[in-house]
Curated annotation (Swiss-Prot):
Calmodulin mediates the control of a large number of enzymes, ion channels and other proteins by Ca(2+). Among the enzymes to be stimulated by the calmodulin-Ca(2+) complex are a number of protein kinases and phosphatases. Ca(2+) 2 binds at D57, D59, N61, T63, E68. PROSITE patterns: EF_HAND_1 (PS00018), EF_HAND_2 (PS50222). Ca(2+) 4 binds at D130, D132, D134, Q136, E141. Coiled coil: none annotated. Gene3D superfamilies: EF-hand. Keywords: Acetylation, Calcium, Metal-binding, Methylation, Repeat. The modification N-acetylalanine is found at A2. Belongs to the calmodulin family. This is Calmodulin. Ca(2+) 3 binds at D94, D96, N98, E105. GO terms for cellular component: cytoplasm.
Amino acid sequence: MAEQLTEEQIAEFKEAFSLFDKDGDGCITTKELGTVMRSLGQNPTEAELQDMISEVDADQNGTIDFPEFLNLMARKMKDTDSEEELKEAFKVFDKDQNGFISAAELRHVMTNLGEKLTDEEVDEMIREADIDGDGQVNYEEFVRMMLAK
């Protein structure tokens, strides 16, 4: 399934994988998965985390390695994000719930994920998604950005 991914997508997923793989050992454990999900405002139970891992854990060793992660991401992309998932994701970024993602809100979420971005990088991300040029990202722009991936 991962064969259908572009090199750019694989590089992005590699970056995402290393955000999850806190200790850099090449595997994502339930603990690491939980940490990242909680930093995104989710609160998965231990059982839910186990389920997520065993769903893609091809060699049944209890962790996710990069090839397994790629398969998971390829599968998720095929299911393309449901309206509901996109609304949830937007809420994670839109901290003050005003219907817009500001540069500060984007920086806050990325920092929680352990991603240290320069102001320039954050501004660049906003610029890429900001179609109407008001300096922030509304829900429409967010959906367009997520579906363009």
